[in-house]
């Protein structure tokens, strides 16, 4: 089968949708399928512009859902997409975030084969979130595009609930996956962090909705009980400099901002963590980073938001705390550090949970859905031909 995977976001920058598309491509190729990825790409960061990626053009950064999305806005985009589709002759085109402006919408307009859309987004808290306004205000324009989809996937029940409020339909829930060969308890920790201190890890962009400031505010309460605790913050973002200045003003030691960490090195940070903490305030359709922590053997403390609650079972394989509540967050981290049997229980349960989300299983579910849609199309075509006769 020849499959075209489409990402509307800049392939040069790391992100959840990009990783999802890349893992699907790798799994499909391993199955023996022919795969191309259509995506914009604007910069040299990382090893990204290589086969099977078809670079569609440059991007423009715009704020979406409490984050920054780099998407392609180009008047010649439709012509470029049409040429690629005519050349490649895909059996299935799978568009991720199909209603995002730019490449996704252009592919929907031009596609003449079975077209699948995966919806990753949920709303950021508040009626006036960007994603809410975009869907509500652009509904008359987006509805005809949505109807061009032969099949719809949502990465979680949360994502399905959000998009179906505006675009009702039959959604297949197929989650994000986790790479168990990459994230594993067998990974060697970073030696500089294996000095007897406890390590609390945060991984994510420094944006408002990721909630890093709530972990920073929890540091004094955690250190009151466990003074020899190190805090590792992995990621980049516009708020990072302000957070670093805050730490400097407090005079805190062992609060480390590691910056951008390449994907190949990230598992060693997870392997070094005694507790993984993700205090996001919303806008998360599913907790992929939580699965990466679980697969690495790091017990999880996270915010009790709908996207995270689809991954973590409270008190069974992690602790969920009230969003924006640094006191409760500090209590949960201290409780895990203080109760080693519970920490080990969460490690064991998390490893089991991660196995349920292994990419080969997830990719096979997507492939099975493709086959269902292709069979439906063949049946429909035969019916139309028989009626014509």
Model-identified regions with their sequence ranges:
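Conserved acidic donor-binding segment of nucleotide-sugar-dependent glycosyltransferases
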Residues: 314-315, 319-326, 335-341
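N-terminal strand-loop element at the rim of the active site
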Residues: 7-14, 22, 26-73, 84
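Membrane-proximal helix-turn-helix segments that form the acceptor-binding/catalytic region
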Residues: 109, 123, 135-152, 165-166
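Acidic donor-binding loop of glycosyltransferase active sites
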Residues: 271-285, 298
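Conserved donor-binding/catalytic core segment of Leloir-type glycosyltransferases
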Residues: 153, 192-219
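Carbohydrate-associated surface elements
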Residues: 158, 177
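Short alpha-helical donor nucleotide-sugar binding micro-motif in glycosyltransferases
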Residues: 260-261, 268-273
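Nucleotide-activated donor-binding/catalytic signature segment of Leloir-type glycosyltransferases, i.e.
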Residues: 241-261
């Amino acid at each position: 089968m020849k499959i075209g995977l489409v990402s509307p976001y800049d392939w040069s920058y790391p992100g959840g949708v990009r990783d999802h598309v890349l893992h699907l491509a790798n799994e499909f190729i391993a199955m023996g399928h022919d795969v191309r990825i259509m995506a914009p790409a604007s910069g040299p960061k990382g090893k990204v512009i290589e086969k099977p990626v078809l670079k569609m053009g440059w991007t423009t950064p715009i704020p979406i859902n409490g984050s920054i999305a780099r998407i392609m806005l180009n008047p010649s985009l439709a012509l470029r997409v049409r040429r690629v589709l005519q050349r490649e002759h895909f059996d299935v085109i799978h568009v991720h975030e199909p209603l995002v402006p730019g490449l996704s919408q252009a592919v929907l307009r031009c596609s003449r084969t079975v077209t699948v859309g995966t919806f990753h987004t949920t709303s950021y808290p508040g009626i006036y979130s960007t994603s809410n306004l975009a869907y509500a205000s652009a509904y008359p324009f987006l509805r005809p595009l949505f109807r061009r989809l032969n099949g719809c996937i949502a990465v979680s029940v949360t994502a399905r609930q959000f998009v179906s409020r505006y675009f009702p339909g039959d959604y297949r829930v197929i989650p994000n996956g986790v790479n168990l060969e990459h994230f594993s308890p067998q990974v060697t920790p970073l030696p500089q962090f294996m000095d007897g201190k406890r390590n609390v890890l945060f991984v994510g962009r420094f944006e408002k909705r990721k909630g890093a400031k709530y972990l920073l505010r929890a540091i004094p309460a955690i250190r009151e009980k466990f003074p020899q605790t190190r805090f590792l913050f992995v990621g980049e973002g516009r708020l990072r400099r302000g957070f670093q200045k805050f730490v400097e003003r407090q005079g805190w030691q062992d609060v480390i901002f590691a910056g951008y960490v390449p994907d190949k090195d990230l598992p060693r940070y997870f392997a070094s963590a005694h507790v993984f903490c993700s205090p996001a305030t919303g806008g998360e359709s599913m907790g992929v980073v939580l699965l990466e922590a679980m697969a690495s053997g790091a017990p999880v403390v996270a915010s009790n938001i709908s996207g995270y609650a689809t991954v973590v079972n409270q008190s069974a394989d992690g602790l969920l705390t009230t969003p924006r509540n640094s006191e409760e967050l500090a209590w949960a981290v201290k409780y895990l550090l203080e109760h080693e049997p519970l920490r080990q229980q969460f490690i064991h349960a998390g490893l089991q949970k991660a196995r349920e989300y292994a990419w080969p299983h997830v990719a096979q579910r997507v492939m099975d859905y493709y086959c269902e849609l292709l069979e439906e199309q063949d049946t429909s075509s035969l019916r139309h031909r028989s009626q014509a006769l």
